[in-house]
Amino acid sequence: MNKINESQLEMDEISKKELHESIIESLLFVSGEPLKLKQISAILECTTKRAQEVLNNMMLKYNDNCRGVKLININDSYQLVTKNENSDYVRKLLKTNTRQALSQAALETLAIIAYKQPITRIDVDEIRGVKSDRAILTLQEKKLIQECGRLDVPGRPILYETTDEFLKNFNLGNIDELPPMEQIASELDEVAVDEEVKEGTE
C-alpha cells in the first residue's frame, strides 16, 4: 500500500470517528437519559469496543474544553450533564435541586442507605431512632433508591439500595466516590438550619 492510500485511509478513519462523535452527541442530547454502551454501539452499528473508544475520546474533549456540559459514565451508561462549577447558575433557572426538594428525614434516610446498602427499613429505623416509612416512599418515588432483594431471615424484609439516578443527581460516577460520612453529616446540618429559617419566616 502506497503512502497516498495510507493517508486516505487515515483521513477516512478520522472522518468516521468524527461522524460517530456527532451521532452520539445527538443521541445523548435527544435522550436526556443515560444510554447504555451496548445501546449506543447497536445504533452506530459498530462494536462496543469501537463505541467505547469514541466515547472515551469525547469525554476527554468535554473535560478539556470550557464547555458547560460534560460526558459522564455511570455503570457503563453515558449521559451529558452540566458541569459542577455551573450548578449555582443552573439552580437559579430551575429554582430547586434534589437536596432542597428532600426533607431532613428523607436526606437522613438517603444517607444511611447510601453508606449501609443493601439495608432493610428496620435497620434504617434503628439507626435514625424513628420510623422511616414515609421517607423511604418519597425516595422511591424520586427514583433515588430501589428494592434490591430480601434479607434471608424470618419475615424476609425488603433490602434497599441507591440507584443510578442517585449517582447522577449527586454527581457521582459510582458509589465508591461517596464523600466521607462527616461531610454528608455537615451538609445535612446545613439543610436542617435552612428548614428552621424557612419555618420561622412562614
Curated annotation (Swiss-Prot):
Q: Which Pfam families match?
A: SMC_ScpB (PF04079)
**InterPro entries recorded for this chain?**
ScpB_csome_segregation (IPR005234), WH-like_DNA-bd_sf (IPR036388), WH_DNA-bd_sf (IPR036390)
Q: Name one GO cellular component term.
A: cytoplasm
Annotated keywords: Cell cycle, Cell division, Chromosome partition, Cytoplasm
State where the protein is found: Cytoplasm
Respond yes or no to whether keyword Cell cycle is given for this record: yes
A Gene Ontology annotation in the biological process aspect, one of them, is: DNA replication
The text of the family note is: Belongs to the ScpB family.
**Subunit record text:** Homodimer. Homodimerization may be required to stabilize the binding of ScpA to the Smc head domains. Component of a cohesin-like complex composed of ScpA, ScpB and the Smc homodimer, in which ScpA and ScpB bind to the head domain of Smc. The presence of the three proteins is required for the association of the complex with DNA.
Q: NCBIfam families, from UniProt?
A: SMC-Scp complex subunit ScpB (TIGR00281)
Biological role: Participates in chromosomal partition during cell division. May act via the formation of a condensin-like complex containing Smc and ScpA that pull DNA away from mid-cell into both cell halves.
- Which protein is depicted? Segregation and condensation protein B
* Gene that specifies this protein: scpB
